[in-house]
Amino acid sequence: MKQYLELCQRIIDEGTWVENSRTGKRCLTVINADLVYHVDKNEFPLITTRKSFWKAAIAEMLGYIRGYDNAADFRNIGAKTWDANANDNQAWLNNPHRKGADDMGRVYGVQGRGWSKPDGGSIDQLRKIVDNLSKGIDDRGEILSFYNPGEFHMGCLRPCMHTHNFSLLGDTLHLTSFQRSCDVPLGLNFNQVQVFTLLALIAQITGHKAGTAYHKIVNAHIYEDQLELMQSVQLKRSPFPSPQLSINPDIKSLEDLETWVTMDDFEVTGYEHHEGIRYPFSV
């Protein structure tokens, strides 16, 4: 929690105003932010200086794991995060590759589970990672990438958190996640929860102990219409201790994650928080 607040304060103190062409808004921006999550100690990085909703974040990651390409599928498992980008983004609405309502195109999990090859085949990156790690193999390339510039035109949004690199040291699994851009007041808590949970899940289904998750952000920003709430409300509050995340121990394989797992298989305990803050969202 401390590192989140320190990043927010750093953006305010050191940030540069940048005009964002996609949203038409200015962002106060810094380059390079590093966050660390101690999954081994179960210090779940859920923001406590405002009420945060962790279930949608985990549901979204579950949708990525399953390779979903439709906002309706995400809604069905508890995440409404793709509704706007799939249905309210004018550039995507005008895109000939859009298949209809709720279609997201070839984004995120589609790339992770079915990266297109020049010969017409596809690569299931996540399956390869899980298979290797389950055998105790780390080939120094256990990398899950959603970033495919050759197909950006076929999706509603380029990936923000685009790469997850797993590393196995002995019987302990670590994760380094890379993010090109982050809306810190709104998006970062989602991303923190997802990085933490992804390491916890992959460690569990491959039979390893979860270690440390490293989260690297390139462009960290606060939109101009979010700044006042951040300065006058959230940064004035004192954080509470981190809560803990429990995952159903019956989840033992990638197939389990693909088929029967729901949000009922996750539980957060010890979550104390301040009142919610309604930050503006930029599509």
Curated annotation (Swiss-Prot):
One of its GO terms (cellular component) is cytosol. It is found in: Cytoplasm. (6R)-5,10-methylene-5,6,7,8-tetrahydrofolate binds at residues 183, 282. GO terms for biological process: dTMP biosynthetic process; dTTP biosynthetic process; methylation. DUMP binds at residues 22, 180-183, 191, 221-223. The active site is at 160 (nucleophile). It catalyses: dUMP + (6R)-5,10-methylene-5,6,7,8-tetrahydrofolate = 7,8-dihydrofolate + dTMP. Keywords: Cytoplasm, Methyltransferase, Nucleotide biosynthesis, Transferase. GO terms for molecular function: thymidylate synthase activity. Its EC number is 2.1.1.45. It is an enzyme of class 2 (transferase). The keyword Zinc does not apply. InterPro entries: Thymidate_synth/dCMP_Mease (IPR045097), Thymidate_synth/dCMP_Mease_dom (IPR023451), Thymidate_synth/dCMP_Mease_sf (IPR036926), Thymidylate_synthase (IPR000398). Its main location: cytoplasm. It comes from the Bacteria. Pathway: Pyrimidine metabolism; dTTP biosynthesis. It holds the Pfam family Thymidylat_synt. Homodimer. Catalyzes the reductive methylation of 2'-deoxyuridine-5'-monophosphate (dUMP) to 2'-deoxythymidine-5'-monophosphate (dTMP) while utilizing 5,10-methylenetetrahydrofolate (mTHF) as the methyl donor and reductant in the reaction, yielding dihydrofolate (DHF) as a by-product. This enzymatic reaction provides an intracellular de novo source of dTMP, an essential precursor for DNA biosynthesis. Belongs to the thymidylate synthase family. Bacterial-type ThyA subfamily. PANTHER family: THYMIDYLATE SYNTHASE, THYMIDYLATE SYNTHASE 1. This is Thymidylate synthase. It comes from Shewanella piezotolerans (strain WP3 / JCM 13877).
